[in-house]
Amino acid sequence: MKPLENAYVIVMVTTPSKLEAERIAQHLLEERLIACANIIGPVSSLFHWSGKMEKTEEYLTLMKSRKDLFEKLSEAVKALHSYEVPEILAFPIVEGSKGYLDWLGSCLR
């Protein structure tokens, strides 16, 4: 099995509100840094911050992109995000239907 030639990724970002998630996704779509975004939530998040355990509701955004666009995508998210340290993670897409992956590639710069 050969890896995908274009190294597509799913990028995960959490935000404190649906509006912020939509604003970030809209900008990334306009810049063609992502092909699409799925906003899920609210979800419960538990984490350590400033020496304390925190619990909050967030919105989880899953975005489809290419690995070579991650640095630009990440910088754009940081510029628009309200968190001091936003969660921006990329996971490789190891397989996918040809039609979907062709569409995904056609949507990106």
Regions found by a protein language model. Name each.
Residues 1-109:
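Positively charged, small/polar-rich N-terminal and surface patches that mediate targeting and assembly
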